[in-house]
Amino acid sequence: MGGILSSLNTSYTGLQAHQSMVDVTGNNISNASDEFYSRQRVIAKPQAAYMYGTKNVNMGVDVEAIERVHDEFVFARYTKANYENTYYDTEFSHLKEASAYFPDIDEASLFTDLQDYFNSWKELSKNAKDSAQKQALAQKTEALTHNIKDTRERLTTLQHKASEELKSVIKEVNSLGSQIAEINKRIKEVENNKSLKHANELRDKRDELEFHLRELLGGNVFKSSIKTHSLTDKDSADFDESYNLNIGHGFNIIDGSIFHPLVVKESENKGGLNQIYFQSDDFKLTNITDKLNQGKVGALLNVYNDGSNGTLKGKLQDYIDLLDSFARGLIESTNAIYAQSASHHIEGEPVEFNSDEAFKDTNYNIKNGSFDLIAYNTDGKEIARKTIAITPITTMNDIIQAINANTDDNQDNNTENDFDDYFTASFNNETKKFVIQPKNASQGLFVSMKDNGTNFMGALKLNPFFQGDDASNISLNKEYKKEPTAIRPWLAPINGNFDVANMMQQLQYDSVDFYNDKFDIKPMKISEFYQFLTGKINTDAEKSGRILDTKKSMLETIKKEQLSISQVSVDEEMVNLIKFQSGYAANAKVITAIDRMIDTLLGIK
């Protein structure tokens, strides 16, 4: 019903609406420094009109909703740009540290240690009897092996640091995820789509948690019923009815108000590095380590994972494997040469196979071919030679039988002056050692081996110069640590013979087999393989750094776009404040005028 009191109510709604606008503006200004606070706007519309006589009369203004200015599509791009930047920032920081362990070859490095090692053999070849040169060789060898082991230990330490960092990151992920699920529950309780009642502060808080969660983990967020709100802002797109955060291409860790935590467990490998499991409703664990390749978690896994449980290897594990291959190639090639130096007996390191296993079925790089066994008398004269063949089905039993067989190796129709008459071979399945020893030690005979492409001596570490299997345990034979003068630079026990020393210095120019798996052998020179290793590490770090620079630029660009939409502009809010204050004052003047009109009416007598 129309009338002067209705007019009073009309202006009163104007006062209330502008009061709300001033309140919202003040709230915007108060939160201007909060990056994740979305500026809010009051959506006002005329109240429903009614018929007054023959006229259609409006009765003031109604505050329909208070909505935040938020573009879900831009925010999604901003979040993605952020977790991509975080991925490469995390990766680069670790790869940069790893590359520092492998400086340029012209600086103090493993490469210079390697050169010093070969130069020591060269100096020894000039004077094979010089005890000082043997001591110098032992010192250079120990320096080389120490730096190889130290470099590997640094890589494994970096690997374990990244693994421990992952554990703390997953704890944070679980905390953020549970908070988001709780907020989803509260939003469901507070909001009403029909009445346009929005929990703006809860949504801002959820956006902030989601931003940081995806920074750590990546993934995709699925929201339904996203709508644009051009009345609020032309760039605004918000409101959803459901919320799911999916990671690993199929695992929902957040499903509305339900959160599925991630579990960290150590792998069964000796390194005990952490892997990630998804826990479903029935508490069943699924290994999703391989499926996480985004955010900080993805970067850490890509850096340190050791490949256990069928997962992919990380870059640090690749570097460790390459360093192990480098050490293994150096060990086997050196020992293959050193085993040719004549001694009173031959003894190998323990192996990991039984005497009835074919060499081809083991992981020992023993090839088809042959090797010669040579017996020398005390004057260094060759007195017997026997050739042993290795085929695809050869076992250690076959080798022992062939060596001990009573054959006429010298082909002089005398079966009592051949190799088997001076030396005997054995292999114990308990100690797993291959041994060749003299039948009569008092004769003082010498024995040596000459390889014809089998790598038998290098693979089994017969009379080794180097002990160990890879970069973790490579070392100078403990006998030569105690007594460097026992190093044998000769091939045959003859004064002035330094053939082994010559072959050792020549080794740096020869092709060597480098491998972790004997079915994937990389034949290279020792220096070439080291340069390949360092080149890969430095190239990976440089590539990651270049991508990081690109991702940073993209993040800054998208961040500016995001902030231009949602961030509070204090200048703009001050303009709005003046406008809303003027509107409030105008409505107040109308009320004052109506109040006087009422006084006039009441004063009529």
Language-model-derived ranges and their functions:
Residues 1-605:
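Structural signature of extracellular appendage/secretion-system components
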